[in-house]
Each structure stands twice: as C-alpha cells, then as structure tokens.
C-alpha cells in the first residue's frame, strides 16, 4: 500500500513538473520569432521570455520586427512597444510612422475578437502604454520634422 502511494506521489510530481515546464510554451525555443509575445503572466519564466524577445529585437540591425504584423498578445506583452520606445532615436521616419500607427491601433486590437482571453487589467495597461508610446513616437517625428 505504501509503495502505491509513493508511486502516485511520484507520478503527480512528474505531471506537475511537466505542466510547469509547458506553462509558457516555447520558452526554450529560440527559433520562434513570436516567442515572448504570448506568455503574458508575471511568472519568472514569462518575464525572462519577454526579456529575451526584446533583446533579440533590439539586436536586430535590420529591424525586420518593425514590419511584423502585431497580435493583441504582442501588444499586451508590451515587447513590441518597448522595442519601438527603445529604438525611437534610431528609427527612420517611415519606421516611426509605422510604430505610431501600430501603437494607435493597439487599443482597438486588444478589445477586438482576437483579444479574447486577455483580462481587463491587461487590456487597460497595454492600452495606456500604447498611448504613451504613440505620444513619444509623435514627439520624435515632430523633432525630426518627419511627414505624418
């Protein structure tokens, strides 16, 4: 009887570990260009995943991420918006305009059908941050006299 209890406890521990490791799927997959966008909780694993994604975006000399189509999850994670904010001095006028349009459309995207599953708090935080980033990008565009 005792051996069976130990076996059940071991099985439960292994299953729990498996669930923990898959909670933020793709954490250890560096090849996924969208990694860091869908893991939205504040667990250490998700925070690390978002940080890794942001570092990869900032290291991209071609800034190919600027033209990627964002998802509501990407807006909610804040990764793309942080990247636009961090690189605003280096972006071309065209890239700044693209970033501003993306930030301006974030609130609508977050509240749309693809944003289902996001909490009201996530939507609110991401919408406020997007508005802040939009203002910063607009200020940068005016300072450089970029055409809207």
Regions found by a protein language model. Name each.
Residues 20-23:
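C-terminal motif of bacterial Sec signal peptides marking the signal peptidase cleavage site
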